[in-house]
């Protein structure tokens, strides 16, 4: 007879995490813990943390993609808080979502008034 001590791990399989099942990078367990700790509701469904982790992962991916585009536009390699802020503030939908958020060490959004612009711009009324 073959003892089970000789076949360690042959029949055993590792538990699959909920993040792995949903193919997510964000930890579903950590999101669930935050939801429970925050006491946002008395009861929490089993799929709510999975869905929220997926939404957060999608939002972070979108913001990072926009920040990477801003970084490339400024001919830089490293994404800095300034690039994240410029990306967020220049996108209407994401800016609405991040309305009350202050990004540390990012500066302000540059706004140039048309009167101070050195280049003469033709208005649309003069073109006709």
From Swiss-Prot:
**How does the record describe its quaternary structure?**
The nucleosome is a histone octamer containing two molecules each of H2A, H2B, H3 and H4 assembled in one H3-H4 heterotetramer and two H2A-H2B heterodimers. The octamer wraps approximately 147 bp of DNA.
- MF term (GO), any: DNA binding
Highest taxon in the source lineage: Eukaryota
Where primarily located? nucleus
Species annotation: Lilium longiflorum
Protein localization: Nucleus; Chromosome
Per its database record, what is this protein's job?
A: Core component of nucleosome. Nucleosomes wrap and compact DNA into chromatin, limiting DNA accessibility to the cellular machineries which require DNA as a template. Histones thereby play a central role in transcription regulation, DNA repair, DNA replication and chromosomal stability. DNA accessibility is regulated via a complex set of post-translational modifications of histones, also called histone code, and nucleosome remodeling. May be involved in the repression of gene expression in male gametes.
Arranged from A to Z, the UniProt key words for this protein are: Chromosome, DNA-binding, Nucleosome core, Nucleus
Q: Which InterPro entries match?
A: Histone-fold (IPR009072), Histone_H2A (IPR002119), Histone_H2A/H2B/H3 (IPR007125), Histone_H2A_C (IPR032454)
This protein's GO cellular component annotations are: nucleosome; nucleus
Paired cysteines (S-S) = none
Q: Which SUPFAM superfamilies match?
A: Histone-fold
Name of the featured protein:
Histone H2A.2
Family listed: Belongs to the histone H2A family.
Among Pfam families, the record links this protein to: Histone (PF00125), Histone_H2A_C (PF16211)
The organs and tissues expressing this protein are described as: Expressed in the generative cell within the bicellular pollen. Not detected in other reproductive or vegetative tissues.
Q: Which gene is annotated as encoding this protein in its UniProt record?
A: gH2A
